[in-house]
Amino acid sequence: MNVQIKICGLTDPDRAAECFELGADAVGLVFYPPSPRFVIDDLALEICQALPKSAPKVGVFVNDTYEFIMNKAERCGITMAQLHGHESQELADRLEKAGIGVIKAFFANRSPDFKAMTEYSAQACLVECAGEKLPGGNAKAWAWRTARGISERMPLALAGGLDPENVSQAILDAMPDALDVSSGVEASPGVKDMDKVKRFIQNATQTGIDYQPRKVFS
């Protein structure tokens, strides 16, 4: 199995569908109003309806309640929640009990907080560079190699500064189970450049690196 790929911050149903045609494993929809990639419920529903029924559809949330997240799942078709704030373990447990897979985001400055990650129980953790107010799409690369210790402990989704040119090196450095890319495949915030998406997926799946990634998006 190749490393899984999530294209995050989709705002257009046709481009979301094309991402899957090109080989993406999941898409991400941002429900955080300050983000330039924020989607309202009606658009999120359109995007989810344009995708294969079995496709993982990941909602990105920041410090939202259980009720808010479940409302988006019911109204828009979200099947997983990516938590980018200070969400409690109790919230993650409630979501998973309700059938919503949880990915917990952590932020790396000089190095990731291994202790916090190993103490938090979720389907997987996502690690990207800290330093911005918005969740994801910050185009900030970091020392991906430091994440290899995480992937030895739990499923890891790698994010932060990924693009078609550096994705092969990122995989070699971190040996992640999944990749999460947003700004690195965009023409402008929220507008995906489908040529970049195609090259990103090709380069990520043709590295020739021999390891066995675990499934993060399902």
UniProtKB/Swiss-Prot annotation:
Classification via InterPro entries: Aldolase_TIM, PRAI_dom, RibuloseP-bd_barrel, TrpF_fam
PANTHER family, per the entry: N-(5'-PHOSPHORIBOSYL)ANTHRANILATE ISOMERASE
EC numbers, comma separated: 5.3.1.24
Protein name (database record): N-(5'-phosphoribosyl)anthranilate isomerase
Organism: Desulfatibacillum aliphaticivorans
First-tier enzyme category under EC: isomerase
Family: Belongs to the TrpF family.
Pfam family, one: PRAI
GO molecular function, one term: phosphoribosylanthranilate isomerase activity
Biological processes per GO annotation: L-tryptophan biosynthetic process
UniProt pathway: Amino-acid biosynthesis; L-tryptophan biosynthesis; L-tryptophan from chorismate: step 3/5
Catalysed reaction, written as an equation: N-(5-phospho-beta-D-ribosyl)anthranilate = 1-(2-carboxyphenylamino)-1-deoxy-D-ribulose 5-phosphate
Keywords annotated in UniProt: Amino-acid biosynthesis, Aromatic amino acid biosynthesis, Isomerase, Tryptophan biosynthesis
